[in-house]
Amino acid sequence: MTERAQTAPGRRTLLGAAVLGTAALGLPGTAEAAGRGAPDARGGGHGSYRDLPVPTVIGHRGASGYRPEHTLGSYQLALDMGAHIVEQDLVPTKDGHLVCRHENDITGTTDVAEHPEFASRRTTKKVDGVSLTGWFTEDFTLAELKTLRAKERIPGNRQENTLYDGRWEIPTFEEVLRWADKEGRRRGRPVWLYVETKHPSYFGGLGLGLEEPLAKLLRRHGRHRADSALILQSFEPTSMQRLSKLVATPRVVLLSGPKERPWDFVESGDPRTVADLVEPAGLKWIASFAQGIGPTLDLVIPRDGAGRLTTPTALVSDAHARGLVLHPYTMRNENTFLPADFRRGTDPNAYGDVFGALRVYFEAGIDGIFSDNPDTALIAAADFAKS
């Protein structure tokens, strides 16, 4: 029996709460007692994103290390474990609803292939220059998507998670907002959300732009202000620029490999790459419309040819010098995803020395981390805070 099977989610939750305390869990603290006022449990008036605990632990697609990603079950577990923020990725349906999926291709994360009534919807598309064959959210109405059920995306790595296949449907973002509002009222504090617009240029070209309907939902739920308990993010900087004109919610630009170009840059002919954006001039430009960056971990500490960590880059200090927070992605507990110097044993799906890896990244000065296993990251953050 593995350690994961021996430790129940409830035990993880209690341990995280006991170790971190109310401040790290985002509970009301001395600032409010001094007169800032009680936060709005719907997600507004909570104070700045800069008041979040550092390192901030972001539940990546919920607690996707333990449940099928982007389900209410995954979000609930991340929150119960004590994650400071819970992440959602947004894609549209054919009839314009925003739903929570990491990609518009739902072949690997739902049971759509088992629905004969949708067999003819299988098609090949080019999304951001990549040819994909499968089933896509923009070809389904919301009512049709609601007949599907979510499943584990990487069952080869996380066989235990397949136990929960078929348990949850695809949530709309509005359903998630209602869930967060309800949980906020129950807990007496806002539930922070981290919301990504996926492939905004692609969807804009289909007449399914993401920014306007997203802004409308944020205003409806009181999460459109600078002090709202929500952060927006995108790999396309122009999506954040558009949203900056619609809502005051904090914004983060996501950054992938150094040689890659954001797809909106490709379409507009902007020659800059991610390598250009992480230079001081690029960071200064990002700081003109965003409050942070979400770089891949390799932009913070590169790996060598053997997959081992090398020397940290200047990205943390350069970003901080321009007032930007850094929330890199993604930490996962399994050996196969860890730097080679923190893998343990020969089983790629066994857990490695995650605590050791997280300490190195925290020592580099990052402000937070996206993690599939928020309970692990919370304990690592508490260990780091005590050191």
Label every model-predicted segment.
Residues T2-S387:
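Phosphate-group recognition and catalysis centered on beta-loop-alpha active-site segments
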